[in-house]
């Protein structure tokens, strides 16, 4: 396993990590969740990602029980939560980034995950109804209390992230260390263009999600739409409509052919492509089966196969390279 610094922090995070969105407490059994965590940990994965909204808190409960049962050395792994969407309840102050909800969400996550502190705590979305100063102060306070080690953002704009940093600098507080954006072969603009200056200035770490574009960059959908897949789950029609377009399927088929020429598989090529980006700190894997995780962990062996020539072949297939504005 390769380990990278998380932004400019001293924290070392495995290049591949394990996420729990749509799987833990929902799509898979607790037994499979445990098998996935063991397989990941035994292969050097040290970061396990979660959030208050995942399965309305049940995902964190499942992960917490597993962590308690396995009894891993707490210094050997990182665990995260995210605050904004709440755990499914919708009364005032049960969502958002107010000081009240941030504090209560952190305490609830610690209880569900059965840990004394969160290594990473993300603001899951920006909150237009809360002053950024209040959010930065709240996160800084949690760090001072020892409940959180590093805080960050998820799906924030570059402007919002920089505003948080400016507030933190002016008030002599701790700013966000990392951002969790979607990043894959079909979703590139934010990481490759919008954040480009932030990488150079404040040194943003990234924990990217959906590296396989919700499964489109696997062989699942190359010849049709099997019903027993993630995109076939009830309530995820919006995800299916956004992810499964004919254009993407055609590109996936071409990429699959290239992967075969390189002696690898499409998911491994897609993951290796993400890993090749030096601004990516860790790639979050989602898996519902242990053998899928085993295959995806092999992506590290494919990175060196993406030579400049292969990278250009990929660009020709994708035909979507983001262009920075001329200013």
List each model region and its residues.
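Active-site groove signature of glycoside hydrolases
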Residues: 110-131
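Acidic-and-aromatic substrate-binding clefts and catalytic sites of carbohydrate-active enzymes
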Residues: 25-28, 51-60, 127-131, 158-159, ...
